[in-house]
Design a protein with these regions (language model features):
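Polyanionic, low-complexity intrinsically disordered segments
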Residues: 1-68, 275-346
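Charged alpha-helical initiation segments
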Residues: 1-25, 80-187
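N-terminal accessory interaction module
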Residues: 46-102
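A solvent-exposed, charged loop/short amphipathic helix patch at secondary-structure junctions
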Residues: 166-174, 218-223, 281-292
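Short, hydrophobic, well-ordered secondary-structure elements
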Residues: 182-209
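Charged, amphipathic alpha-helical oligomerization/scaffolding segments
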Residues: 197, 257-264, 268, 297-300, ...
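Short non-catalytic regulatory patches outside canonical folded cores
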Residues: 202-260, 272
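Histidine-centered, metal-coordinating catalytic motifs and their short helical/loop contexts
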Residues: 252-284
Length: 346
């Protein structure tokens, strides 16, 4: 259908306004969905002729150029037409969550995405908060930051009671018990989250490799090792994924503590039981591990897991961006490491 005159001008103005609305939403500049939807509620064809001409002039001399600059600055292949399609999808659902690769195929790759350290299995999340990304390491690392801070805070609170004799402590038994419960809970969270972070990082490596490389050249055993992330053990992921993907091995002393010591605590938390672990897994007392998870073990676990991740990251080469979540977890963990070092010197 060929539009003429007023109708063609109305469509031109409407489309430009819809594209602008999407741009503002992606930048987090929309105050409400009502504001976002407003450009689509106007019957532009019924505007007075003078107003229609004025808006058309503004679109052609200003608005379209602003839209094009926005696309060029933030996307590789975004167009006005694609922005309008994105508007229609957002109008239907209000928010949008879509895998990054699907977003690239449907709309456009996003400028600076890989350079900033986001993994390609990220989910693109568009809402009134703007354009954001979500992926497992992001969630687990943020959870770890919170839990580590809770450990530090509770330990600081306990320090104020250290120089008191037991008779004095009995007077504050309720307060002390509450602090101890907080620190014990936070330590359990840190241990579980540290392993979850490591495993989702390793699974992400395998997924990315399978997406980019021609894995048909690999043996069936190696393909299954990469793809069957549910049944492949953590030990095999740490030791085999770097070899398959980068042709390099993790140093044995890098993962000994995590696999042979820390994992016993983690397994006792994930599978608590009065039964001891099977002999092939060390035959250790699960309850003993469950009840005696101390700050030194937590600190060593975090330190070694960070070292494993950084060793693998180094295999990617100097030009590979640092995972966007890694600096924050390192900075937070440093405070815990300092606390452990301080306690040892007392």
């Amino acid at each position: 259908m060929i539009l003429k005159g007023r109708d063609r001008e109305a469509v031109l103005i409407r489309n430009a306004n819809l594209a602008c609305a999407v741009g503002k939403l992606l930048l987090g500049e929309m105050s409400s969905w009502q504001e976002f939807l407003e450009p689509d509620t106007i019957d532009y064809a019924k505007l007075p002729r003078k107003q229609l001409k004025s808006r058309k002039y503004d679109v052609q001399t200003n608005l379209q150029n602003r839209i094009d600059r926005f696309c060029d600055l933030n996307f590789h292949k975004m167009t006005r037409t694609k922005l309008i399609s994105l508007y229609e999808e957002l109008k239907a659902h209000r928010t949008l969550e879509i895998p990054y690769l699907e977003f690239c195929e449907k709309y456009s790759p996003i400028t600076g995405f890989y350079e900033k350290g986001f993994p390609e299995y990220s989910t693109v999340c568009i809402s009134l908060w703007g354009l954001q990304y979500r992926f497992p390491e992001h969630d687990f690392s943020n959870d770890m930051v919170i839990a580590i801070n809770q450990v530090n805070k509770a330990e600081e609170e306990l320090e104020s009671y250290q120089k008191r004799n037991h008779k004095q402590l009995l007077k504050n038994q309720t307060e002390i018990a509450d602090i101890v419960r907080k620190t014990e809970s936070a330590k359990r969270q840190v241990m579980q989250l540290a392993f979850s972070l490591l495993e989702c990082y390793l699974n992400g490596l395998a997924w990315s490799y399978c997406q980019k490389e021609n894995i048909s050249t690999l043996s069936n055993r190696k393909i299954n090792t990469l793809k069957d992330t549910f049944n492949v053990s953590l030990r095999d992921k740490i030791q085999k994924y770097p070899t398959i993907i980068f042709g390099k091995k993790i140093k044995e002393n890098s993962c000994n503590f995590v696999l042979d010591k820390a994992k016993q605590f983690r397994d006792s938390l994930m599978h608590p039981s009065p039964f001891s672990a099977p002999e092939k897994f060390g035959g250790y007392d699960k309850l003993e591990k469950l009840f005696n998870l101390d700050i030194e073990t937590i600190s060593k676990t975090i330190s070694d897991i960070i070292d494993i991740i950084e060793e693998i990251e180094a295999m990617k080469g100097k030009n590979s961006p640092v995972p966007i979540w890694l600096p924050k977890i390192k900075e937070t963990a440093k405070k815990l490491f300092q606390r452990v070092t301080k306690d040892r010197t007392l």
